[in-house]
């Protein structure tokens, strides 16, 4: 089987992934990380791009918030976040898109300033080297919180007690959350465990053969599970994925 895999990770923020014109979303990233860690596959290239074109404070704050959805999978031996700045050269896809005033922000290069002035004059610096822009200070906050997750261990268990499904979450081996998951919530977790699911398919599955349940109940259950960081989905309930693994069923 596979021992190591490289994949396009790039960000924990849906908006940033769109700004970088990526075809994947954060739900895809969760799915990939979840099952790679389950099967012991190393992910050495979980690169997080900082300084992306169009990046805003709110995007970095979303990245910080979304770190918690991956809390069970931080393992420096398997899955490590690498924060790297976006670098632009004249053959980069973004180079032609950026107006000159925006390109001026990309002025950081370790070598260019060492060149003699005579060499630099009249030369398109982007033809010689790639450059990055100054980093937003919020990335330092992201880095510190990211390190916190790697320095501590989250775990969980799912059990059945008197016919009830009980979810227990621990932080550094100490229980911190105990939650009864109703039949509908547990069905959602199982349906979204092994694939990224759309809202129509999930609602259809939840309503099949079940009286007294409508779409509103399903969306309310999804909201609660996301509030507890047990499922993730983007705006409009698209791309739903369970954060936890429901196989084996109880452990």
Language-model features and meaning:
Residues 1, 161, 226-227:
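Short, well-ordered loop/turn elements at secondary-structure boundaries
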Residues 52, 94, 231:
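Short loop/turn segments at secondary-structure transitions that flank enzyme active sites
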Residues 9-16, 21, 47-50, 90-92, ...:
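Active-site proximal loops enriched in glycine and acidic residues that flank catalytic Cys/His/Asp
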Residues 38, 57-187:
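C-terminal scaffold of the Radical SAM
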Residues 53-54, 96-97, 241:
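Short catalytic/ligand-binding loop motif for oxyanion handling, primarily in non-cytosolic enzymes
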Residues 179-251:
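Long, charge-rich, low-complexity alpha-helical segments
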